[in-house]
Amino acid sequence: MENAHAFPPALCKRLVGAGAIAVLVIDNVDHAVRVAEALWKGGVEIAEVTMRTPSAAESLALICKELPEMLPVAGTVLTPAQVDDAIDSGAAMAVAPGLQQETLRHAQQRGLPFAPGVLTPTEIEKAITLGCQTLKFFPAATGGGLPFLKSVAAPYQHLDLKFLPTGSISEDAMENYLAFPATMAVGGSWIAPRALIQGEDWEEITRRAQRARKIVDAIRREG
């Protein structure tokens, strides 16, 4: 395995400590800072802004500017152009639902930590050959859940792969994913779903963030 493209130790430590990644779909740029503030108030330190809407790049840039203490992640990064957008917006890292070699290589060349999406052993091995050690496990819940992740991760334990399980993971399931040693952090849209953002229900988002933080803290104390 190539090690040149491994995530920096400081970033890995931040991901593990934070534990929860709020996966966001932001339609209105005016909501960007408000939702980030609500998450931070509740104890969630990582905001993944999915690059699915016209306002995504600007929203990510605003979060980076107004809440520099947060860890900004660009999500659903599918093309080299979106890699450039993520970097220009200030993203600390990027993730994707799948693995596009051209996009991954561009991120590596530009120095942006990038976790491609994988589900099967074949996809994991392709990511390994391309120098990846931190992988997004997607779609986690519908793709077999934690039992499947444990099974596909087992043959690669000696490579110290780390996973970011994401995709329909419920609040109740989050604890078990975090307890798995190969899990670095868990992504969840339940913390700040699109409907709550559109409805500007910042208090409810903060309450959900607090619950996520409580789950992370409980697991980290046990570990």
Please identify what each model-predicted range represents.
Residues 61, 150-153, 175, 210:
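Active-site phosphate/pyrophosphate- and oxyanion-stabilizing loops and adjacent acidic/basic residues
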Residues 127, 131-138, 147-149, 155-161:
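A contiguous pocket-lining binding segment that forms or flanks enzyme active sites
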Residues 74-75, 164-169, 186-189:
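Glycine-rich beta-strand-to-loop/alpha-helix junction loops that act as flexible
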Residues 35, 79-89, 122-130, 153, ...:
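Catalytic cores of alpha/beta
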Residues 23-25, 45-53, 70-78, 83, ...:
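Catalytic beta/alpha-barrel core
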Residues 93-106, 136-146, 181-204:
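Glycine-rich phosphate-binding active-site loops on the catalytic face of alpha/beta enzymes
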Residues 1-90, 109, 179, 199-222:
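Conserved N-terminal beta1-alpha1 strand-loop-helix module at the mouth
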